[in-house]
Amino acid sequence: MEIHPEQTALCEDLIAPCGMNCGLCIAYLGRKNEINREGFHRTYCEGCLPRGKGCLYMAGRCARLENGAVRFCSECPDFPCRRLRNLDRRYRTKYHMSMIENLRDIQKNGMEAFLRKEAERWSCPGCGEMICCHNGLCLRCSLDVLKNDKKYCWGIR
């Protein structure tokens, strides 16, 4: 598989402490693809770490993350904590991904192998751009689907 430099999932800085790959998030991909120019009204995000405010889901709720004692939740003796388990359950149910599995994969196989796996799993077969984990669409190839149904999520209408 050819790896395109613009693939957002291939950046370690976009892996949040909770295990979320921010490069697959609608707020990040929307910014990258400038979907608001197409009539959307979405909040854009650079990713949890690049925006300099830490993990969106754990910020202010985890002293170890706040004081820099850990980079990833998986480095914490309380891993996985209740908050992360709840977040993980929601993402597994709605968005076909698991933050806990991501973190365990990084622990077991390393960041480079994890990023390669993410690129293979989430690349659009049409253009190579990342598929959004929140709706299952490539925002480069399938933006018209989202225009017709702004609440589209993984084929469920």
Question: Language-model features: where?
Answer:
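Short Cys/His-rich Zn2+-coordinating modules
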Residues: 2-7, 23-32, 56-60, 103-111, ...
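Short, flexible, mixed-charge glycine/proline-rich loop motifs
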Residues: 9-16, 34-40, 50-54, 65-67, ...
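Charge-rich, low-complexity N-terminal segments
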Residues: 11, 33-36, 44-48, 79, ...
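Cys/His-coordinated zinc-binding microdomains
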Residues: 26, 49, 63-66, 77-80, ...
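Short, non-ligating residues that shape and space the ligands of small metal-coordination modules
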Residues: 31, 54-55, 82, 133-134, ...
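Short, surface-exposed polybasic-and-hydrophobic patches located at secondary-structure transitions
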Residues: 34-42, 86-112
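Short cysteine-rich clusters marking metal-coordination/redox-active sites
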Residues: 45, 59, 73, 124-127, ...
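Short Cys/His-rich micro-motifs in 6-15 aa windows
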Residues: 142-152
